[in-house]
UniProtKB/Swiss-Prot annotation:
Part of the 50S ribosomal subunit. Forms a cluster with proteins L3 and L19. In the 70S ribosome, L14 and L19 interact and together make contacts with the 16S rRNA in bridges B5 and B8. PROSITE patterns: RIBOSOMAL_L14. It comes from Methylococcus capsulatus (strain ATCC 33009 / NCIMB 11132 / Bath). It comes from the Bacteria. The lineage of its organism: Bacteria, Pseudomonadati, Pseudomonadota, Gammaproteobacteria, Methylococcales. GO terms for cellular component: cytosolic large ribosomal subunit. This is Large ribosomal subunit protein uL14. Keywords: Ribonucleoprotein, Ribosomal protein, RNA-binding, rRNA-binding. PANTHER family: 50S/60S RIBOSOMAL PROTEIN L14/L23 (PTHR11761), LARGE RIBOSOMAL SUBUNIT PROTEIN UL14M (PTHR11761:SF3). One of its GO terms (molecular function) is structural constituent of ribosome. Gene3D superfamilies: Ribosomal protein L14.
Length: 122
């Protein structure tokens, strides 16, 4: 459950280490984002010579949450951290690698690139 001011780890090699959610996209009254939702983020910590710089604003998709994802069979998949993958304006990932597991809920037409790059899909 991600809301404004939530800090997330970055699960790709775009150069950012940590980002902060500045808006949950999808309507003015929308408060929370879950796995698979697109949010607007600001880069808070970045490595030198990365593709992104501190202070820049990007779209990102949430790939892991501590709140977890409830499946239809009743199971709950939780993670140790909140993580996102940074996207460009065409909603394609900026990085070329994904770190850590992602959930099957990302398996829509929009995020198949993230699924194919991920080392593990739960």
């Amino acid at each position: 459950m991600i809301q404004m001011q939530t800090c997330l780890d970055v699960a790709d090699n775009s150069g950012a280490r940590q980002v902060m959610c500045i808006k949950v996209l999808g309507g003015s009254k929308r408060r929370y984002a879950n796995v698979g939702d697109i949010i607007k983020v600001s880069v808070k910590d970045a490595i030198p010579r990365g593709r992104v710089k501190k202070g820049e604003v990007y779209n990102a998709v949430v790939v892991r949450t501590r709140k977890g994802v409830r499946r239809a069979d009743g199971s709950l998949i939780r993670f140790d951290n909140n993580a996102a993958v940074i996207l460009n304006n065409q909603h394609q990932p900026i990085g070329t690698r994904i770190f850590g597991p992602v959930t099957r809920e990302l398996r829509s037409e929009k995020f198949m690139k993230i699924i194919s790059l991920a080392p593990e899909v739960l």
